[in-house]
Amino acid sequence: RDGNQALIDPMDPERKLRMFKTLVRMGFKEIEVGFPSASQPDFDFVRHIIEHDLIPDDVTIQVLVQSRPELIRRTYESIRGAKQAIVHFYNSVNPLQRRVVFGLDQAGVTKIAVDAATLCRSLEPTVAGTRVRYEYSPESFTLAEPEFAVAICEAVMDVIEPTPTN
């Protein structure tokens, strides 16, 4: 997650805004601004910086989301109106979580990732005017079979169709 939820004293919106503005002043061009589907404050923060035109033209915001359809849809609602955004989606891929959490094999977990990528692509028209890029993370991949970690990323790339500039 963006780490804010793990803090003993999570940042309030004003503090997050100070942090965002500081990162912009420092010259960062890609800034993760939250996990808008995980909490209303994160959603509201993303909407605030978009609606108040606080994102410089040369800065891309990034939002984090689990590979779950309802959360992906909510995330796209949050970025509507941004000039550019990176949607960073993820799902766990290690054998223990595949078995215990999802009750799925490699094919089933790959389907979660591919379905998420497909949904993301299908939602692009809902944020017309926003240049959307993607980041996919196979969460806990270091505990997964290396061949599987590579294969699931390749399956996602087949949907996302990355280019050198996107």
Q: What does each of the following model-derived ranges do?
A:
Residues 2, 6-31, 46-56, 69-166:
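Alpha/beta enzyme core
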Residues 33-38, 64-66, 90:
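Acidic/polar N-terminal loop/beta-strand segments that form early-domain functional surfaces
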Residues 37-41, 142-144:
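Conserved glycine-rich "GG(E/T)P / GGGxP" loop and the immediately following alpha-helix
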Residues 55-63:
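A glycine-rich helix N-cap at a beta->alpha junction
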